[in-house]
């Protein structure tokens, strides 16, 4: 049995400014960096064998800060574009509220939340799921099958797509899924290849509790 832990990056500058980010490479805010460090402290007792992230700085920096805070800075890291955020096409860089005013709230909601809604020149969630799930099964699952704990630092829609698969969510259900900044989402990978979601932290399933230190009486 191995543990898969997925984490959305911390708050970025464009998240703070309420802009569509997509594949635009923007840095974390100071709050986002603090969120990543806090996440690392939360999951410090899970010994990771390998970590995966996207080609975008905000996810890479989040992963680095998590591993440093978890005192596991030497965990091997694999970067791949398949884990990038959903591409928002012509919406990238635009303010979300202004975009809703221009195109209509329901249209923008469909673009953002539905499975098949596709913004102009961009990807739908279904498109994102096709690339991210292909990579997940080809590269990440084999590590879990080998009994290795895996950490993934990625993006809201990438993680939403993987959750849709692992939790068997309907298109209606996935519209309601919200992925918070730096809140770990964990799944146990079972010997039969199935996944079951677990609460974090679950250090007891990874490492047995240490016995209390014995006091040494003075002679």
Curated annotation (Swiss-Prot):
EC numbers on record: 5.4.2.11
SMART domains recorded: PGAM
GO biological process: gluconeogenesis; glycolytic process
Signal peptide: none
Site (Transition state stabilizer): 155
CDD domains: HP_PGM_like
Disulfide bond residue pairs: none
Gene Ontology molecular-function annotations: phosphoglycerate mutase activity
Family, as annotated: Belongs to the phosphoglycerate mutase family. BPG-dependent PGAM subfamily.
Protein name, as recorded: 2,3-bisphosphoglycerate-dependent phosphoglycerate mutase 2
Classification lineage: Bacteria, Bacillati, Cyanobacteriota, Cyanophyceae, Gloeobacterales
Annotated gene: gpmA2
């Amino acid at each position: 049995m191995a543990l898969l832990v997925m984490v959305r990056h911390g708050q970025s500058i464009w998240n703070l400014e309420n802009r569509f980010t997509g594949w635009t490479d923007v840095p974390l805010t100071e709050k986002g960096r603090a969120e990543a460090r806090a996440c690392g402290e939360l999951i410090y007792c899970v010994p990771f064998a390998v970590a995966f992230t996207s080609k975008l700085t905000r996810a890479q920096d989040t992963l680095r800060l998590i591993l440093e805070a978890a005192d596991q800075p030497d965990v091997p890291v694999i970067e791949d574009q398949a884990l990038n955020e959903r591409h928002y096409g012509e919406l990238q860089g635009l303010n979300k509220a202004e975009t809703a005013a221009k195109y209509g709230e329901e249209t923008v909601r469909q673009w953002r939340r539905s499975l098949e809604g596709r913004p102009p020149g961009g990807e739908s969630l279904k498109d994102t799921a096709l690339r991210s799930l292909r990579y997940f099964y080809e590269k990440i699952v084999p590590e879990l099958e080998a009994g290795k704990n895996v950490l993934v630092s990625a993006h809201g829609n990438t993680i939403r797509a993987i959750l849709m698969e692992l939790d068997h969510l309907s298109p209606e259900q996935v519209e309601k899924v919200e992925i918070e900044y730096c809140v770990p989402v964990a799944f146990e990978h079972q010997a039969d290849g199935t996944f079951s979601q677990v609460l974090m932290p679950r250090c007891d399933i990874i490492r047995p509790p240490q016995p209390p230190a014995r006091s040494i009486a003075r002679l």
